[in-house]
Amino acid sequence: MAAPAPRAGRRWWPVGLGVAALVAWSWHGTRVELGALLSGAALAQIAAYLGRLFPPDLSAVALRNAALGAWETFAISLVGSGLACLIALPLAVGASATVLYRGVLYERRRPGPLAGLLRRALGLASKTVLAVCRTVPEIVWALIFVFVVGLGPLPGVLALGVHTGGVLGKLFAEVLDDVDRAPIEALQATGAGRLAIVLYGFLPQALPQFVSYALYRWEVNIRAAAVMGFVGAGGLGQRLYVALNLFHEHELLTLIAAVYVMVTLVDALSAWLRARLV
């Protein structure tokens, strides 16, 4: 009984060696030199810059600026996450093979050849849209929307909505494909149509996981919203960019502290909501 274990271990050796070789090759290719970072001159420069950050700027103007930026970033992340859910849900239904063209819904009555082809085409189109949305990073979407609609919070909201919509759509589709078939069969036994089965059989089972994924992505988006401000998408990131360019180090530390406080509070709020809703 114990004989297969060594063979399994031996199978992993080539994979482990290959990964190690790839990491070593990548390290060499990027020409990373930790010695330069840990040299006396570099450490002295880091210490000097950190010294210029303190003390933080606690003036009324700086605190108001940080509070407004934090509120704007919070709003961007929340509205962007809500937009993402609106984008993800219909595309997830279209991308779910179990809902659209195969599985328990179609064991008793299969769609005709033309209807089946159209359903598969719709599924492919939905998956393609989701793939495009999620493979382009948020900051690239933000740059695109800055050029389209101008500076401010709107491009940040649109960027988060599009990218996160693609991520959530893929996750939602996988959840729909893995629902328990027993409630579906019970609804079929009552003569319910496919739309009713999707609404009352699929979605109630999937909803807790939908909420969990959406809350997790909101936690990710609050960080992304802060970064997107560096390309003009509003929020704390835009204020951080200005403070860096103007060498306002004391205000910069205040803004960094605001980012930390905001992210910590959102993480705690998301965990509290997940514990009560999921």
Model-derived features with residue positions:
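Hydrophobic positions within alpha-helical transmembrane segments of bacterial inner-membrane proteins
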Residues: 81-89, 93, 97, 139, ...
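Membrane-spanning helices that line or support transport/gating and their immediate boundary helices
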Residues: 89-97, 171-178, 182, 221, ...
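Generic hydrophobic transmembrane alpha-helix motif, especially the helices
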Residues: 110-159
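Glycine-rich helix-loop "coupling/hinge" segments at transmembrane-helix boundaries
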Residues: 147, 160, 219, 224-259, ...
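N-terminal, non-cleaved signal-anchor transmembrane helix
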Residues: 1-82, 86-90, 94-124
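C-terminal transmembrane helix and the adjacent membrane-cytosol boundary/short C-terminal tail
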Residues: 212-215, 253-278
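Alpha-helical membrane-interface segments at transmembrane helix boundaries
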Residues: 67-75, 123-133, 215, 219, ...
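Membrane-cytosol interface at the C-terminal ends of specific transmembrane alpha-helices
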Residues: 144-202, 208-217, 268
